[in-house]
Amino acid sequence: MRNDEGLLEPFVQEVRRLYPFFPAVAARVKSTFEWQGYRFPKGHRVLLDLYGTNTDRRSWDAPVEFRPERFRGRAENPYDFIPQGGGNHYTNHRCPGEWIAISQMKAFCRYLVNDIDYDVPDQDLELDPGELPSLPQNRFIMRNVRRRQ
């Protein structure tokens, strides 16, 4: 990303797709409907599986692989990429902080890539998706952190 600012947005979006902040979000059914033989009565609570939707093979090629390039030139659709909920920001319920989160992730990535040098020792970066928030086993260890001259 240091030499390709155009990779920053796809990188951040791929992190959000593969590692959503929450695995699911809850909602209340606004009006009774039926979908694939299931009845959803008005007022009932439902869960939207964010991780499952963002790794669905019907929508994503090689869905569990980290491939930021999949977001280069990708047309936005408010319903198929839903790391912080689905729908239109202006007319539906979607996380109002989503743009702030994206902006902060980009700023942090720029800082890590352009402003400091550091070493990353061998460590266990495996994530436990059953934990909230899902963190690497060793967290993330950086050594010899120094401001770039």
Please give the residue ranges for each predicted region:
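Conserved cytochrome P450 K-helix E-x-x-R motif and the immediately C-terminal K′/meander segment
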Residues: 2-38
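Conserved cytochrome P450 K-helix/beta-meander segment immediately N-terminal to the heme-binding cysteine loop
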Residues: 49-75
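Short, glycine-/Ser/Thr-/acidic-enriched flexible segments
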Residues: 52-53, 89, 147
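Cytochrome P450 heme-thiolate "Cys pocket" and heme-binding signature region
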Residues: 59, 72-117, 124-132
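Charge-rich, low-complexity terminal tails
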Residues: 128-149
